[in-house]
């Protein structure tokens, strides 16, 4: 089964821009959520996953979703 990546980003975050570009370069299935106008949702994600920076990158494979981390974690995951 194909992997699907989900990115939670903020527009003006340099690492978010780089993560977004990375999924486009890789040509992987992905969904991007821009959270600039959704501070409550961003706060919920940070608290639930105990991960306090953006981007927040997730991968879903075989029906299981896991947090990869941020931009550098995504690049390492692709390698």
Task: Kindly label every feature range from the protein language model.
Residues 42-49, 76-79:
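Short amphipathic alpha-helix with an adjacent loop that forms part of the alpha/beta core around
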Residues 14, 36, 75:
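Nucleotide phosphate-binding site architecture
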Residues 1-30:
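Local sequence-structure signature of Cys/Sec-based thiol-disulfide redox active-site neighborhoods
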Residues 59-79:
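Non-catalytic, surface beta->alpha helical segment in thiol-disulfide oxidoreductase systems
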